[in-house]
Structure formats: structure tokens, C-alpha cells
């Protein structure tokens, strides 16, 4: 099948930002200007096309990253047709997992910044995630019409907080109520969009006299930046003191794709200004699937392998999202990295070791769908009929097996107990929760062994509220929800050597397992590490996995208050066995006995989740807010000024933050807002730890 759009004209991009930076409105405008959506969807009235789950429309926030395909020929119609696959990602901290999944399969991203709020905590998180996956970015400074908008302040914050290299390729003409249009520094023209046509028409004029000097300064900085892309461009620049439009675009493109610069644009999506030029910048500066390195993975023998982006190579794809669609059931969203696939074909899932048949193939436009027969390299599509695929699995050709790199998902920090309101709901609740856990790897479900209660865990209160809400709406299950509980952890602080023996020998076949372990603290965030240091077969090879399994099982319940144990390194260095009585179970038990004993002797401590909290408050209430955060064991990290407001950054234990929004509202007459995200685990003070242990 010849591709309608050549691969070099594909753009797989994400729109990412802090909550309320205007991301969904920006995505809506992309759909409108690319001609897909004829009525502008506004988040304010709950009608945005991208936000297709009911809760998203009610709350005005984006939860599920909808994948949408659209086409663009440039705002002046002067480009060949490009195909843009847009993934709209949530900006609320409880949904960072969605962002992580989307970034894994994107080639480039547009980061939307609020011209007033600038770099906010979630922007930093998303930026770090994009760095991790090496995603080239553009910056779109939105809401230039808002009171307090300041384009250059956002640039300074990007340098100081994100440690990045922003290069303005536009300047705003005016700001706040006076924001009229932008100066295109590449063409050195002023661009004004026409309100009557909702911004579909625009005109280019000469740059206003009052801005010419400024424009010349910033253009020179941009041209210098482009010249640094290659020796050839640098020589041209040194000879002539300037570069042609083509050379500027080529230089900026190379440096953007290499993650050396971030081109900066501005506008107001809500007022239909600037998104059109941002789409042109997506074509000019963000990579096609051909511009990014071949994707790496491992073949069936565990040897590193790769797949180049070509339809002639064997099929390989990554499943990055699972969603339940009200009409067709379970949809598996995937990104094709090489080869092609038709509906009805059989693919292999090397992670599960299973063959699967692709039923229907769908291309999504928000929640409208188009059935297609075939997808190929660079495409993002959804498949129906895959039974055992979970997020992060690879799908590949049966004869050319490859496992692409898997994704890392964060551990939940908050738990609540849920119980169905009626007996009838009991079974339905189990099905609903398992389905939701399959869709969202940062959401976990387990049964508490002691109480028999169903415990659900997630990334924050809002995350779990939405899960309970979805159980009710999509599965008809009413549930009672307990008070949120913090996900504490346990760790050790000193090294110990410890013996564990499990012996039962009273005639006949007995049990004999004997181990010596060395336990020591591991680096924070490294988790559990097992080292096999057995010499001379004192513990036979076949029993060593049983020792590791015994240790892993013991990690689930620490000795202080039964919380999971993290960041511990355990070496098996000695032991003994019995020719007849030793077996796997005996060694598993011996390891478990040694671990529990070792924990008690290794200075066990309780760890609590610390949150990065940012409060934006009118200056008059600053004292109250700071005092309140300090009373919650918060440590103030810094403050920033924005007109009329103070932004307070602090680190506060999650346990102290339940119900904070109500307190903040009453302390500031409802005028302050805050955001919060998980930062790291830290040792709980002695008095706090004792109170928690005594409660257990």
C-alpha cells in the first residue's frame, strides 16, 4: 500500500502542560484549523472535542490522552499536506502516568505555558519526563491576553527552572488587553489574525516602528542560534552577517531535533491567535518518524536489536494505552515503529509470549472513529480484539521477534478501602476494578489479608475519586469509600549479617534450609537488589531463586507497622543444605526468617511521601498561607512574585495535606489555588513514626 502521506510529512506530537495552561483549548484549535472540527469546543462550557469522558467535561480537566489524526498545509496553504497525530495529555499531577505513556510514543511535543503562571510544578515534571525520553519540544506561551501576561518572564523561568535553552522565533505585539498579534522573527513581518473568521484568515504587515529595534535584537539571537547547527551555516553567517529563511529554518530544525534548543512562540488559543503559526512551527521544527533514531529492543535470545522506521522492515509496535470504549469494547492504542499490519493479521506479544489476532483497526479523532484496513510505520491507531495486551507491551511480527523497551510506572502514594453498597455489586466491582487497573498501570487493586477489604491505590485523591466515579458511570457499581490512607514505606539504616534456619527433621522426609544474609541500605529509589555471593556450592544453584523469592515475599510487610520495605540490598553469602531434606520451600522459609530478623536489627525506619506543593495566593494572605504550611511540617523552598500574587513553593508530607483545599479556600477567601505532586520518600520524624506504629 502506497502511503497517502510520505513518512517525512508525518508528525507524531503531544500537547503537554500544567493544568489550566490552556492545553485542551490549544488542542481544540488545532482540530478546528486543520478542518476536522467545525464548531470550536470550549472547555468552559464542557463541550471540548478532545475531552471525551463525562468526568473530564464536568471537571474541565483532561484525563485520558485522546489520539487524533489531522492534516495541515500551513496557515497560508504553502506547505505540502502533512499528517499530524496529536496526543492530548493531562496536566493534572494525579495523571502523570498518562503523560509518561504518551511521551514514550511521540516524536515531538508542544509545551503550553501560561503567560501569567509561567513554569509551574507540573511543567517541571512533564519537562523531566520529556528529557527522559529525549523528546524535542516547542514552547507555546498561551494566554497572552490575560492580565499579568509576560512572555520574557516565561523565557527567564524556562532558563532558570527547566535549565533549557529557549529561542524566541516570535515576539508578542502588546500584552494583556493590548495583545494584537505576533512578530514572526524568521520573516521579519507582523502577523494579525482576523477575529471575524475565528482566526482562519490573517494578514502580514510591516513591524510596528516602536518594535523594530527589539525585533532586530531578538532576530539576531535567533539567527546566531540557527548558525550553530553546522559549520556550513556558521561560515555563511560569518561571511554575510545573516542567513536566508530556508537556512534559519534548517538550522533551528537540526538543533531542535537534537534537543539543543526550544523554539518559543506565543498567542492566545482562546482568542484564536497564534495556534495557526504554532502548527506551521510543528512542520518546520519537529521531527518526522524518519528523523529519530531507530527504536531499540531485544530479540528472542536477549540480544540488543533495533527496528528502523521503514515499511519494508518487519512489523513492530508498542501498546501505550488501553481504553474502554462504550461502543466497541476495549481499545488498545499503539504506535507502529516499523512494517505494516492489516486487520485480521496475527501478531506476537513477546512480553506475554502469546499470539493475538488483530480484529478491527480504528483511527481516532477524539471519540469519533474511522475504520481502516491497514496501518504502517509512523501511524498511531487503535485495535479491537486483543485480549491479553497491557500498557507497555510490544506487538511484533511472528517470525521476527523483538521486545521494545518497556515503560517505568511510579508506585502509588495513597490508598483507600472501597466496598460495594450491595451484594449484587460485589462481583461487578471486582470486574470493574480489574478492567480499570488494566487501563491504568499507576492504579492498583489488592485485598487486605487481615480485614478482607478491597484496597485501591493511586497517585492522589483526585485520581481515586475519578476511578470510583468511573465504576459508577461505566460499570453501574455504587461503592462506599473509606478515608484516604498514606502509603508509608519501611527501610533500614545500617548493615547487618544475619542467619536464617528452617529445619524440621523428625523421621521421614524433613525440611532443611539454612542461609546467611548480609542486609544493607540501598540508594534511595533503587528498590530491592539481590546479590548471589555463594562460593563452592554451599547452597546449591537450584535453591538460590527460592531464597530470592522468599526475600521478595517478605518485602510486602515490614517489621515496624507492616508497610512495604524499600531500598534494601541483600546478599546471600553463606549457608548449608541437606542432601535429602533440603527443598525450595525450606530455603524460601529460611530466607524469610532471616529477613524479618535482620530488619529488626538493622535500625528500621518509617518513610513517608513528601509532596512538592505550590500555592498561588494574593499577597495579603501570604503570612496566613506560609504559617499554615509550616504548621503542617512543611519546609518552604522559595517564593516568586507575579503581579498581585505570591507563589509559595514548599515540601510538605502527604499525611498533612488531606482536606487542604477547603482550609486554603477559607484562609484566602477562595482566592488562592494550589497544586501538589509526589516528590520523594523521606524518613518520618520519631514522634510521627511512633504515632503511626501505635495506630497499627
Swiss-Prot record:
Gene3D superfamilies: 3.30.230.10, 3.30.70.240, Elongation Factor G (Translational Gtpase), domain 3, P-loop containing nucleotide triphosphate hydrolases, Translation factors
GO MF terms, alphabetically ordered: GTP binding; GTPase activity; guanosine tetraphosphate binding; translation elongation factor activity
Pfam families given in the database record: EFG_C (PF00679), EFG_III (PF14492), EFG_IV (PF03764), GTP_EFTU (PF00009), GTP_EFTU_D2 (PF03144)
InterPro entries, per database record: EFG_II (IPR041095), EFG_III (IPR009022), EFG_III/V (IPR035647), EFG_IV (IPR047872), EFG_V (IPR035649), EFG_V-like (IPR000640), EFTu-like_2 (IPR004161), G_TR_CS (IPR031157)
Protein residues bound to GTP: 17-24, 88-92, 142-145
Biological processes per GO annotation: ribosome disassembly
Subcellular location(s) of the protein: Cytoplasm
Chief localisation class: cytoplasm
Top-level lineage group: Bacteria
Disulfide bonds: none
GO cellular component terms given for this protein: cytoplasm
Sequence ranges assigned to domain tr-type G in this UniProt record: 8-290
Keyword Cytoplasm: yes
Keywords on record: Cytoplasm, Elongation factor, GTP-binding, Nucleotide-binding, Protein biosynthesis
Family under the similarity heading: Belongs to the TRAFAC class translation factor GTPase superfamily. Classic translation factor GTPase family. EF-G/EF-2 subfamily.
Functional summary from the UniProt entry: Catalyzes the GTP-dependent ribosomal translocation step during translation elongation. During this step, the ribosome changes from the pre-translocational (PRE) to the post-translocational (POST) state as the newly formed A-site-bound peptidyl-tRNA and P-site-bound deacylated tRNA move to the P and E sites, respectively. Catalyzes the coordinated movement of the two tRNA molecules, the mRNA and conformational changes in the ribosome.
Protein name per UniProt: Elongation factor G
Species for this entry: Nitrosomonas europaea (strain ATCC 19718 / CIP 103999 / KCTC 2705 / NBRC 14298)
Biological classification of the source: Bacteria, Pseudomonadati, Pseudomonadota, Betaproteobacteria, Nitrosomonadales
Name of the gene: fusA
Amino acid at each position: 500500500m502506497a502511503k497517502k502521506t510520505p513518512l517525512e510529512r508525518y508528525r507524531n506530537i503531544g500537547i503537554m502542560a500544567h493544568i489550566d495552561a490552556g492545553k485542551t483549548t490549544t488542542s481544540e484549535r488545532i482540530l478546528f484549523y486543520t478542518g476536522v472540527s467545525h464548531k470550536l469546543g470550549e472547555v468552559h462550557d464542557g463541550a471540548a472535542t478532545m475531552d471525551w469522558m463525562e468526568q473530564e467535561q464536568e471537571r474541565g480537566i483532561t484525563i485520558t490522552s485522546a489520539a487524533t489524526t489531522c492534516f495541515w498545509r500551513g496557515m497560508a496553504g504553502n506547505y505540502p499536506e502533512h499528517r499530524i497525530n496529536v496526543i492530548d495529555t493531562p496536566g493534572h499531577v494525579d495523571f502523570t502516568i498518562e503523560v509518561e505513556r504518551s511521551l514514550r510514543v511521540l516524536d515531538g511535543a508542544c509545551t503550553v505555558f501560561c503567560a501569567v503562571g509561567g513554569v509551574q510544578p507540573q511543567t517541571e515534571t512533564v519537562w523531566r519526563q520529556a528529557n527522559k525520553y529525549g523528546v524535542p519540544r516547542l514552547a507555546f506561551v498561551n494566554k497572552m491576553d490575560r492580565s499579568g501576561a509576560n512572555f520574557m518572564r516565561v523565557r527567564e523561568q524556562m532558563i532558570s527552572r527547566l535549565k533549557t535553552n529557549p529561542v524566541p522565533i516570535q515576539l508578542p505585539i502588546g500584552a494583556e488587553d493590548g495583545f494584537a498579534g505576533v512578530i514572526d522573527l524568521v520573516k521579519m513581518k507582523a502577523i494579525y489574525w482576523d477575529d471575524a473568521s475565528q482566526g482562519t484568515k490573517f494578514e502580514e504587515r510591516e513591524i510596528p516602528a516602536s518594535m523594530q529595534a527589539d525585533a532586530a535584537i531578538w532576530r539576531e539571537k535567533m539567527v546566531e542560534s540557527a548558525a550553530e547547527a553546522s559549520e556550513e551555516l556558521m561560515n555563511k553567517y560569518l561571511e554575510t552577517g545573516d542567513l536566508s529563511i530556508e537556512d534559519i529554518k534548517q538550522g533551528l530544525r537540526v538543533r531542535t531535533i537534537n534537543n539543543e534548543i526550544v523554539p518559543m512562540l506565543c498567542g492566545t488559543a482562546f482568542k484564536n491567535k497564534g495556534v495557526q503559526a504554532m502548527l506551521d512551527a510543528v512542520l518546520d521544527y519537529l521531527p518526522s518518524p524518519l528523523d529519530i533514531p531507530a527504536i531499540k529492543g531485544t530479540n528472542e535470545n536477549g540480544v540488543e536489536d533495533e527496528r528502523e522506521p521503514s515499511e519494508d522492515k518487519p512489523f513492530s509496535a508498542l501498546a501505550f494505552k488501553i481504553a474502554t470504549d462504550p461502543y466497541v469494547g476495549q481499545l488498545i492504542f499503539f504506535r507502529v515503529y516499523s512494517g505494516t499490519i492489516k486487520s485480521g493479521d496475527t501478531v506476537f506479544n513477546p512480553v506475554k509470549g502469546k499470539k493475538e489476532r488483530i480484529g478491527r483497526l480504528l483511527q481516532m479523532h477524539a471519540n469519533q472513529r474511522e475504520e481502516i484496513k491497514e496501518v504502517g510505520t509512523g501511524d498511531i491507531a487503535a485495535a479491537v480484539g486483543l485480549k491479553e495486551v497491557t500498557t507497555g507491551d510490544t506487538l511484533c511480527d511472528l517470525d521476527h521477534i523483538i521486545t521494545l523497551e518497556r515503560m517505568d510506572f511510579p508506585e502509588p502514594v495513597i490508598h483507600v478501602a472501597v466496598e460495594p453498597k450491595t451484594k449484587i455489586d460485589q462481583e461487578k466491582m471486582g470486574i470493574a476494578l480489574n478492567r480499570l487497573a488494566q487501563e491504568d498501570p499507576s492504579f492498583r487493586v489488592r485485598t487486605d489479608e487481615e480485614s478482607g477489604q478491597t484496597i485501591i491505590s493511586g497517585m492522589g485523591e483526585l485520581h481515586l475519586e475519578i476511578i470510583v466515579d468511573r465504576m459508577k458511570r461505566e460499570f453501574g457499581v455504587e461503592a462506599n469509600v473509606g478515608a484516604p490512607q498514606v502509603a508509608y514505606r519501611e527501610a533500614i539504616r545500617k548493615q547487618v549479617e544475619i542467619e536464617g534456619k528452617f529445619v524440621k527433621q523428625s523421621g521421614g522426609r524433613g525440611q532443611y534450609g539454612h542461609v546467611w544474609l548480609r542486609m544493607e541500605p540501598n540508594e534511595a529509589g533503587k528498590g530491592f537488589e539481590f546479590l548471589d555471593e555463594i562460593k563452592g556450592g554451599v547452597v546449591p544453584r537450584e535453591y538460590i531463586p527460592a531464597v530470592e523469592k522468599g526475600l521478595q515475599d517478605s518485602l510486602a510487610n515490614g517489621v515496624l507497622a507492616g508497610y512495604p520495605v524499600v531500598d534494601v540490598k541483600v546478599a546471600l553469602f553463606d549457608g548449608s543444605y541437606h542432601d535429602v531434606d533440603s527443598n525450595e520451600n525450606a530455603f524460601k522459609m529460611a530466607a524469610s526468617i532471616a529477613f524479618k530478623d535482620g530488619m529488626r536489627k538493622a535500625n528500621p525506619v518509617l518513610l513517608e511521601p513528601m509532596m512538592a506543593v505550590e500555592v498561588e495566593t494574593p499577597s495579603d494572605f501570604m503570612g496566613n498561607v506560609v504559617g499554615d504550611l509550616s504548621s503542617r511540617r512543611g519546609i518552604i523552598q522559595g517564593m516568586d512574585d507575579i503581579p498581585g500574587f505570591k507563589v509559595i513553593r514548599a515540601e510538605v508530607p502527604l499525611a498533612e495535606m488531606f482536606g487542604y483545599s477547603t482550609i486554603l479556600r477559607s484562609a484566602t477567601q477562595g482566592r488562592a489555588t494550589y497544586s501538589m505532586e509526589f516528590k520523594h520518600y523521606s524518613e518520618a520524624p520519631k514522634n510521627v513514626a511512633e504515632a503511626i506504629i501505635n495506630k497499627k
